[in-house]
Amino acid sequence: MKAIILAGGHSERFGKAKAFAEIDGQLFYQRIVQTLQETNMFNDIIISTNDQLANQFKHDNVIIDDANNKNKGPLAGIHTVMKQYNDEELFFVISVDTPMVTGKAISALYQFLVSRLIEDQIDIAAYSEHNRVIPTIAFYHPNCINVMDEALASNDYSLRHVYNNVTTECLDVTNIQSPEYWYKNINYQEDLDDLKQQINH
């Protein structure tokens, strides 16, 4: 099973590439890599990014988005990696701007997926908040590839396009009680300031 860290966004709202922002003395991407490694669930951790940022990562496996799908957001990153590893059975996707994700949360979502697979075929198992799917904390099955192809060829290459057209099951974020900020994504510098305050509270 492989993990994909989505780190190719332009981060206009944040002011710089979020992958290299710091929390608790660690860069966001390095913290997530460490969390993923500590789960012992993944045989590979892949950073998905763009050609401008790729050489700034100190990581063994960095994959640049397919040039044909440039500027098509996180879907392009997930699709590029899944196409390269087309014999893999499952991918965990996490956005680099969710630095406090925990191994407990990742493991719980995997257990949720496995328990549902006994009854049904599930293509995406994601977290949700207030019934809103969080597609960047999710497991993706390769069955999604055809719908991803269609989405990238259309004018709607949102992840919503994908999860609405495959079998998606969600686990509410409140199932993981601590820390309460584990799933928060950082869009603005103020979000990072708030997170630091919560951590040090």
From Swiss-Prot:
Q: Name one GO molecular function term.
A: metal ion binding
Positions of GTP binding = L6, A7, G8, K18, D65, D97
Give the highest taxon in the source lineage.
Answer: Bacteria
Question: So where does Mg(2+) get bound?
Answer: D97
- CDD domains of this UniProt entry? MobA
What cofactor is needed? Answer: Mg(2+)
GO CC annotations on file? cytoplasm
Subcellular location(s) per record: Cytoplasm
Its main localization is: cytoplasm
State the EC number(s). 2.7.7.77
Reaction(s) catalysed (UniProt annotation): Mo-molybdopterin + GTP + H(+) = Mo-molybdopterin guanine dinucleotide + diphosphate
Membrane-spanning intervals of the chain: none
| Top EC group | transferase
Q: Which UniProt keywords apply?
A: Cytoplasm, GTP-binding, Magnesium, Metal-binding, Molybdenum cofactor biosynthesis, Nucleotide-binding, Transferase
A GO term (biological process) for this protein?
Mo-molybdopterin cofactor biosynthetic process
NCBIfam families found in the cross-reference section: PRK00317.1-3 (NF001457)
Q: What's the family? A: Belongs to the MobA family.
Q: Which function does this protein serve? A: Transfers a GMP moiety from GTP to Mo-molybdopterin (Mo-MPT) cofactor (Moco or molybdenum cofactor) to form Mo-molybdopterin guanine dinucleotide (Mo-MGD) cofactor.
Q: Domain description from the entry?
A: The N-terminal domain determines nucleotide recognition and specific binding, while the C-terminal domain determines the specific binding to the target protein.
Which named protein is this?
Probable molybdenum cofactor guanylyltransferase
Naturally occurring in which organism (per UniProt): Staphylococcus haemolyticus (strain JCSC1435)
The record's gene field reads mobA
